Regions:
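Alpha-helix boundary/N-cap detector
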Residues: 42-45, 108, 112, 145-148
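Glycine-rich phosphate-binding P-loop
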Residues: 1-21
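Short, well-ordered alpha-helical microsegments
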Residues: 12-14, 70-75, 93
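Conserved nucleotide-sensing/catalytic segment adjacent to the nucleotide-binding pocket
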Residues: 22-84
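Structural motif
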Residues: 6-9, 66-70, 88, 137-141
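Hydrophobic/aromatic beta-strand patches that form the interior of the parallel beta-sheet core
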Residues: 3-5, 25-27, 84-86, 133-137
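NTP-dependent small-molecule kinase module
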Residues: 123-159
Length: 159
């Protein structure tokens, strides 16, 4: 059974899939399961299906990535579903903004990240949910794909 991972914007989900996609089974619910309306807002009618399909995907995958939004995380929390959450320290805001500019993210998305970065990190820090295992990426250049926790997990799959 695989683990469920939620990652803050810019924590390296796409990079991780590119590097490890041929070594382990990765399912990306963010890309694979419909969750939003045409206008980009989360559709509450799709949320139950999203959670159920994500849980089913853990049976055939080593890692399942889920959406970072509070709505999705709250749905997992309400159902007491364990997941790992990777997020940066507030001190890394400029690094994350710069990386999004380099990646050529849409300007409005960069503005949203810039405007909400500290608030989102504070919300995660304040979250006391028992089934959310938080991993703060405090060091410059530290992302999902190079954290010891994930590396140990990947190594354990090979055994």
């Amino acid at each position: 059974m695989g683990i469920i991972v939620s990652s803050f914007i810019g924590c390296g989900r796409e990079f991780f899939k590119n590097v490890y996609g041929d070594k382990i089974k990765i399912f990306d619910a963010v890309d694979e399961i419909p969750l939003t309306d045409i206008d980009g807002k989360i559709n509450s009618d799709l949320l139950d299906g999203y959670v159920n399909e994500t849980l089913n995907a853990t049976n055939n995958s080593d890692i399942v990535f889920i959406d970072f939004s509070n709505t999705v995380r709250n749905a997992f929390n309400e159902r007491n579903i364990d997941y790992d959450l990777f997020y940066p320290s507030k001190e890394r805001k400029n690094e994350f903004i710069e990386n999004q500019v380099i990646k050529r993210t849409k300007p409005k998305d960069i503005q949203t990240l810039d405007r909400n970065f500290e608030k989102w990190v504070d919300e995660i820090d304040d979250d006391k949910t028992d089934n959310c295992y938080k991993h703060k990426l405090a060091n410059k250049g530290e992302f999902i794909g190079n954290t010891p926790l994930i590396m140990q997990y990947i190594d354990s799959l090979k055994q």
